[in-house]
Amino acid sequence: MNFEFEREIGFINSQPSLAECLTSFPAVLETFQTSSIKESTLIPPPPPLEQTFPSLQLGASTLQRPGSQKQAGDGPALRSPPPLPVAPPAPEFPWMKEKKSTKKPSQSAASPSPAASSVRASEVGSPSDGPGLPECGGSGSRRLRTAYTNTQLLELEKEFHFNKYLCRPRRVEIAALLDLTERQVKVWFQNRRMKHKRQTQHREPPEGEPGGPSAQDDAGEPAEEPTVSPGDVATHRLREACFHPAEAAQGPRGAPPSALPATTLESVGASSPGCTMLRAGGRQSEPLPEDACPERQDSPFLPDLNFFAADSCLQMSGGLSPSLQGSLDSPVPFSEEELDFFTSTLCAIDLQFP
């Protein structure tokens, strides 16, 4: 018993193979063999089961019958589709035939377009025939252009001159007056606006643009005035000589005294006494050589000259004519006589206050 129990325990724990189990238990082997034999004999019985259950046979027969019917019906079904596509296309797709029918007349209408254009050209003069022609053009192909009469074009141009964009009530009114459709009036105004835009872009801007040739010429003239006319330079030098004689005497920084122009020498000579010789009439003043009137920054007369130069300018501006007063403030160039008179008066005023 213990041995058998141990073997059972070992069988449970070690899990031997099926062969060992069958050899160790002969009774089990016999039962296994008999059961396997019985099962082998029972494998073919499915047909007997169908015999025992007649409902299964009925289901199988019903399943087989529709299949046979389907197989039998597939033949005519496959044969029947060829006639089906022949009949349905006409009612199912009528729009395809309509498009073809419309395309054919459009091509035929496009061919006699020269004749239609000649007819329109002959009938342009009559305003009564105008509305009929656009209708023909609208009903035909789109390539045909609307032929407007002279009166229609005149009225449309007048309206475009006052209003480049039409509201719908006005458009309807014009269309009724000119015997045109509202769409024709709208399209004409659209085309006219585009034409006006092209004209304004390609013609007017080159003349008025800042980069245009005329604008460059206009801009170049004032730029050349300060360089060509010495009047502005002379007035600037004279003002500097009136208020800052020492700086005017030195001239621009780094420039040698010999490089100063005659106008600066005259203005500098006007601020210092004894540098110019007045002629009898007081019309001209000749500057002396540079060695004859040396300018020194450490001269004790410079502060007095500064003070009296400002006063002399004020007195001179009060005694001058109104034209000269205006010319001092304006960029208009002075004439040579005015400049000479101006320098001589400055020198005369400076000589009064040694």
UniProtKB/Swiss-Prot annotation:
SMART domains, per database record: HOX
An MF annotation (GO) of this entry: DNA-binding transcription activator activity, RNA polymerase II-specific
Residue span of region Disordered: 39-143, 193-231, 246-295
Main location: nucleus
Keyword Cytoplasm listed: no
Annotated GO CC locations: nucleoplasm
Ranges of Pro residues composition bias in the record: 79-92
UniProt-annotated location(s): Nucleus
Biased composition (Low complexity): 104-118
Domain of life: Eukaryota
DNA-binding region(s) from the entry: 141-200
BP term (GO), one: dorsal/ventral pattern formation
Keywords: Developmental protein, DNA-binding, Homeobox, Nucleus, Phosphoprotein, Transcription, Transcription regulation
Location of Phosphoserine modifications: 272
Span(s) of short sequence motif Antp-type hexapeptide: 92-97
Annotated InterPro entries: HD, HD_metazoa, Homeobox_Antennapedia_CS, Homeobox_CS, Homeodomain-like_sf
Keyword set includes Transmembrane: no
Polar residues composition bias: residue spans: 52-71, 264-274
Quaternary structure and partners: Part of the nuclear protein complex gamma-globin promoter and enhancer binding factor (gamma-PE) composed at least by SATB1 and HOXB2. Interaction with IFI211/p205.
Family: Belongs to the Antp homeobox family. Proboscipedia subfamily.
Function: Sequence-specific transcription factor which is part of a developmental regulatory system that provides cells with specific positional identities on the anterior-posterior axis.
Protein name: Homeobox protein Hox-B2
Classification lineage: Eukaryota, Metazoa, Chordata, Craniata, Vertebrata
